[in-house]
Amino acid sequence: MLFYGTELKSRLMLGTAQYPSPEILSDAVRAAEAGVVTVSLRRESAGQRAGQAFWSMIRDLGVPVLPNTAGCHTVKEAVTTAHMAREVFDTDWIKLEVIGESDTLQPDMFGLVEAARILSRDGFKVFPYMTEDLVGAERLLQAGCEVLMPWGAPIGSGKGLNNVFGLRALRAHFPDVPLVVDAGIGLPSHAAQAMELGYDAVLINTAVAKAGDPVRMARAFRLAVEAGLIAREADPIEERDMAAPSTPVLGRAMLA
C-alpha cells in the first residue's frame, strides 16, 4: 500500500505511548510487524536524556516514523508542533491532530482543514485525524492531504467502529484515496472489520499498550489485519434477509 509514494510493509500502524516499559514496546512493534510507528514530540521533549534514549530505540527498530501533534487544540499550536517534529524526527510526514472537544477528543474539522492547508503549503505530507464527515474529507483533500484517517470511536475508548455507515460512505465516496481507521479500536475483530469494509490500514495504540500482554495482543492485531484483508479480497458473500439452504436438495428422499 502506498502512502505519499512510500510503500509500507504492513497495513498495521502502531502507536508508541502508554507501554509498561521500553522493552515491551520494542517487542510489541516487532510482534505487530508494524508498517509505521507514531511518535509524539511531547514525549521526545519530556526529558532530554529520556527522549534521546526513546528516539534511539525507535530508530533501531527500523520502522518508518509518523510524528503526531497530539494534544494540540489550536491551528497555531498544531502547525508549530509539526515544524518542531520535522526538525526532531527528520521527516516531512505528520499525523495532524487538532482537538476540538476535551471529553471526547473529537477532531476540530474546521481547524484541521486550516492547519492541513498551511502544512501542505509548507511541504508536509499530512495524515489528518478526522471524523467520518464527508464534506470535511473533501475539504482536507482540497487542502493537499492525500491520506485520510477517520476515527472509529473516541481515542482510547475501545468501542470499535461506532459509525459503520459513515465509514462505509467514506470508502464509497473516495475509492482511490488511502483510508486509515484511527482511534477507538479495542479488539482485533474491530481491526478485521475495518479491513473488510475496504480500509487500507488501521492505527492501534491503547488496545495494545494497555492489554494484559501487549506483545501477544500486537501479534493478534497483525493476524486480524491480515485476515480482514484476505477476507475482503476473497469476495465475501452479501448479507441476506432470508435463509438460503447450504445443503443441496437434489437426490434427497421425498415423502408423498
Curated annotation (Swiss-Prot):
It catalyses: [ThiS sulfur-carrier protein]-C-terminal-Gly-aminoethanethioate + 2-iminoacetate + 1-deoxy-D-xylulose 5-phosphate = [ThiS sulfur-carrier protein]-C-terminal Gly-Gly + 2-[(2R,5Z)-2-carboxy-4-methylthiazol-5(2H)-ylidene]ethyl phosphate + 2 H2O + H(+). It is found in: Cytoplasm. Pfam families: ThiG. GO terms for biological process: thiamine diphosphate biosynthetic process. 1-deoxy-D-xylulose 5-phosphate binds at residues 156, 183-184, 205-206. The active site is at 95 (schiff-base intermediate with dxp). Keywords: Cytoplasm, Schiff base, Thiamine biosynthesis, Transferase. GO terms for cellular component: cytoplasm. InterPro entries: Aldolase_TIM, Thiazole_synthase_ThiG, ThiG. It is an enzyme of class 2 (transferase). One of its GO terms (molecular function) is thiazole synthase activity. Pathway: Cofactor biosynthesis; thiamine diphosphate biosynthesis. Catalyzes the rearrangement of 1-deoxy-D-xylulose 5-phosphate (DXP) to produce the thiazole phosphate moiety of thiamine. Sulfur is provided by the thiocarboxylate moiety of the carrier protein ThiS. In vitro, sulfur can be provided by H(2)S. PANTHER family: THIAZOLE SYNTHASE. Belongs to the ThiG family. Homotetramer. Forms heterodimers with either ThiH or ThiS. HAMAP family: ThiG. This is Thiazole synthase. It comes from Gluconacetobacter diazotrophicus (strain ATCC 49037 / DSM 5601 / CCUG 37298 / CIP 103539 / LMG 7603 / PAl5). The lineage of its organism: Bacteria, Pseudomonadati, Pseudomonadota, Alphaproteobacteria, Acetobacterales.
